[in-house]
Amino acid sequence: MLPHGLIVSCQALPDEPLHSSFIMSKMALAAYEGGAVGIRANTKEDILAIKETVDLPVIGIVKRDYNHSDVFITATSKEVDELIESQCEVIALDATLQQRPKETLDELVSYIRTHAPNVEIMADIATVEEAKNAARLGFDYIGTTLHGYTSYTQGQLLYQNDFQFLKDVLQSVDAKVIAEGNVITPDMYKRVMDLGVHCSVVGGAITRPKEITKRFVQVMED
């Protein structure tokens, strides 16, 4: 089980300056030394490098685009197999109701339970309906990861109206809820923890210096 506390997302996509399994392992080490209780990471290679560097539970994902589907976070059993090989403690997957490129969501859950019974599963959702569906399918954790990042929630921010969407999710499911997506300040992190989430994932505000720099520059340009 993931501990209560701060999970730091250590990811860099191929077009980003820090794209490197070695660099992500050092980012994870910095997060560990700062007090993080877990890491969220993308790709088998990054996860293996991170697990060689820090003794923290890892939420693993594989981001991969597929034609004719907007689902790109651990979309099929191919990505699941890669994550099982990485020996991450938690596999996270897109649990939205969008059209999937291959297996259905419940088929993927069954696949993980069969092939990796000791691995927990996290649902990345965008709506309360999707949270309820994930709870019905037996996900161990439900994360607000994709709220604001789907075509039908675009422009919505997790912290709007004092985290009302997060409150709605917490009231709608019994599963452990993870706050993720636009938790961008220590005060926001404290607020979501006070609301009763099991843990919170913070990424860009900690591990994406290019984006952090752009925010500083932007305030003067605006």
From Swiss-Prot:
The lineage of its organism: Bacteria, Bacillati, Bacillota, Bacilli, Bacillales. The keyword Isomerase applies. CDD domains: NanE. Belongs to the NanE family. Its EC number is 5.1.3.9. One of its GO terms (molecular function) is N-acylglucosamine-6-phosphate 2-epimerase activity. It is an enzyme of class 5 (isomerase). Pathway: Amino-sugar metabolism; N-acetylneuraminate degradation; D-fructose 6-phosphate from N-acetylneuraminate: step 3/5. This is Putative N-acetylmannosamine-6-phosphate 2-epimerase. Signal peptide: none annotated. The gene is nanE. Pfam families: NanE.
